[in-house]
Amino acid sequence: MSSSTEIERNLELEILCKNIQCADKSKRQAALNELLQSVSKQSTDEDLKNLLDLTYLHLVKCYTDKFEAIRSLAISIVNEFLKCFQTRNEFFLDYIIPTMRRRIGLPEMVEESEEIQLELLTQLGHIVEKFQSNDTDTLMRIYNDIMDILVRNLTNRYANAHRECCKAIQLLATATPSFYMRAESLVDPLTELLCHRQSATRTIAVETLGVVCLYITNKNDKIVKSIVSISPLLTDSVAAVRRMCGIIGCKWLIELRDRYSFFERIVPLVLCCLKDDLVDIREEINTHFIRCGEQFFDENQQELQRIELIDHEYPCSNYVALVTKTRPTLGCRALVEKSLRMINIIVKEMLDWKEPVRLHSLKLLWEVVLFAEKAFTCKFIEVFPALAKACQDDENSVVKEAKRVAFLMGQLLNYNDWMEITMRDLKKFPNCLGILRCFNSLFAGAEIEHKRNSVEEIAKLISTSEMCHNLNEGYQSALLDLIEQMVNIHLTKIENESGEEKYLFEILVKTIALSNAHENNEIATRGLSLYETFCKTPENRVFLQGMHMTDVINDIEDLDCEHSERSERIIMLFGCIKLCGFQKEYFSSIQTAVKLVLENSTANAQIKILSGLSMAFLNWNHENMQGSAMNLLSIFIEDILEPVLIWKAGRNAESIRAMATQALCSIGCSCPDEAREIFPKLSKNLISLIEDELAVTRAYAIRCVLKAGPFLYEDYRHLVTEILSRLDDPCANVRCLAIECLPQLEVNPSDDMFSETGYSSLVEYIISRLFLYLDDPYIKIRPILLDSLAKLQKKHPVVFENEIKKLPTNYLYNDIIEDLKSARLE
C-alpha cells in the first residue's frame, strides 16, 4: 500500500472515530455501521489489529452508550473482530471481559436491556470458545471476572439469559484448567434453575450442573446437593428433562471424582430412567448404563472375573419371560449391588405422603431388585415393612406396583430367608392386609419346588382364628388369592398330606362363610368355585365336611358372649351352617354353638342363625345322617327350637319365634317322615303359635300342622278350635292355609281319650263352619274351600251329607250341592 493511500486511510479512520464520538446519535450509528463493514473487509490479522488499535477505545466506550442501538452495534463489531481474527488478541480479555463485568456482572445490574444482556452473554461464550486451550491457561487472569458474570446472570429474570449462561459455563469448563477453583459457586444458582417453569431451561440446567460437579473438589456437600436437587426431575412431565437426568447420571458414574462414594445416590438417577414410560429414553439410558457397567467391570476386573466364571445361568427358569428383556450385564449388576445403601432413601420415599413419589420409589425398587438379584436378600428385612404398607395403600396404582416388586423378589431372592421374615410378621400382625398381599405376591413369584414344601406350614398359620376370621372385603379377596395358589399346588401333588388338606379345607370354609357379610357376592362366588375345585367330587366334599367341620365350628370362640348380627362369630356360624348343612359327625357341635347364640346373643343375631338353620334344614341330606336322623332331629328340636317357640313378650321375641317356626317348617318340608312323628309332640307349642301376633308365624305354624302325623284327641280338639278361629284371620294367606289344613288334620284313634261321638261332632262343626265362608270376598279362597269340602266329603261322606241337608235353599248352596253330588270336585 502506498504512503498516500495509507494517509488517506488513516484520515478516514480518524473521521470515523470522531463520528463515533459525535453527540448526534445518527452519526454515531452510521459510523459504527461503516466500521462494521470495514472489519469484514480486512484480509489479514495485521490489518485487523491496526484497525482495532485505532478504534478499540471508542468501541469500549460505546458499550456504555445510553442508546441501546449503539450498544448493540458495538457488540456486533466486537463479535465481527472476534470472528475474523485468526489468532488470539488480548484485547478481548483485557478490555471486553472487564467491561462486560461492569455491565452485567455486578450485584446491581447496570445493563437494563434484556436483549443487550443476552448479546453480551452470547459474546462471552464466543470469547471463551476462542481462547480455550489445553496448553496454556490464557483465561486464568480474567477467570474471576467471567465467573462473576456467570454467577450473577444465573439469577437473571430473563430465561434466554439463563440458557446462554449455561452454555458459557459448559464451554468454560473445558476451556480452562482453572475452572475447578470456583466451580462450587455455580451449584446454588444452577439448582434454583431446576425448578424453572420452562422445560428447556430445566434441561440445560441439569446438563450444566452435571458438568460443574465433575470439577468440584473437596466439596462433597455440593455434589450431594446437586444429586438431591436433580432427583425430583426424574418424574418431570417433559421427556427431555427426564432423559437428561439419566444421561448426567451415567456421565457421573464414569467421570465423577470419588464417584464410588456417591454410587448409592447416582445409580437411582439411571435406574429410574430405565423404568421411564418412553421406550426411546429406556433404550438410550440402557446403552449408556451398559458402558458404565463395562468400566466398573474393568476397574474391578480381578474380583468380578471370579464371579463371571460361575455366573452364567439365569437365577430362575422363567427369568426372561418375567422381565421381558435380557439379563443385565455382570458389571451393571455389580455396580448396583455396591450401591445398595440407596435402599434407605428408597424406603423413606415409599412412605412419603405423595402418591406419585410412592409410585416412583416402587418403580425404582423394582429395578434395584432386578439388578441386585440374590444380593438384595440382605436388604429384604429393611424393605419388607415399607413394601407391605405400600400393598395396603389407598391408591390402586401403588398397590399394583408394590405387588409387582414383591413378585420379583419372590423370583430372585433366597426363598428360605424371605419366607422366615414374612411368616414371622404374619404371626405378629395377623390382620394386616398389606402383609398378606405382599406375602401373596412373594409366594406367587417363588419356584414351585420351594412352595410345595411350605403349603402345610402356611395353611396351618392362615387357618387360625387370628388370621382367617376377618370381615374386611379386601382382606378376604387377598386371602382367596393365596388359598388359590396353595390349592393349585396341593392338587398337583401325587400324595396329599392329611394335615395340609385339613387346613386348606378350614380356610376355604371360613372364608366363604365370612363372605356373607358383604352384599358383593364376588368373593363368595370365587370361594365356592375354589371350594368345588378343592373337593373334586360331591362324595369327597361330604367326606371332608364330616372329617373337619367339627374343628371349624369349635374354632368359633366366645359364643357365650353377647354378639350382634354383624359380629364376625355370628356371620361365621351362619355361613358354616348355610354352606355345609348337617352331618352326623358335627351335628352336636352345631347344636352346642347355636344354643350358646340363642342364650347369649342379641335378637338380630338369633334371628340370623335361625334363618341359617332354615336354609340348612331345607337342604337336609338323609344319607349324611346314616339312619340317625330321627334321633338327632328330636334332640335338636327339644334342646334348641322348642324353648324358643314358647311365647315371650316383645317384638324381638315375636321375630325370633317366627324364625324358629320357619326352621321347624323347613324340617317338615325336608324330613316328612320324621316330622310326622315329631310334630305331634309339639302340639301345645303349635296351638300357641297359631294364635301368635305375627301373621308369618301363624302361617308357618299351620304349615307345620299340615306336616304332622295323628295328634292325640285332646290336642286335636284344641287344634281344630284354633285353626277354625283362623278362618277370620285378617291375613288371607293364613285363612287359606287354615282351610287347607282342616280336612288334613288327623287324630290318633288309639288314644284313650278318643271318642267317636265327639270326633263326629267336631267334623260336623268343621264342615258347617266351612260352608259359612263360601261367600268370602277373597277370590283365591273359594277354590281352596271347595277342594277342602271335597276332601271332607270323601273322608266323612255320611256326616257331610247330613250337613248338606241342613243348608238353606238358595242359589249359592244349591250350586255347591250339585257340584259335590256330581263328584266334580274329587
Language model features: what each stretch is:
Residues 1-826:
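Extended, low-complexity, acidic/polar intrinsically disordered regions
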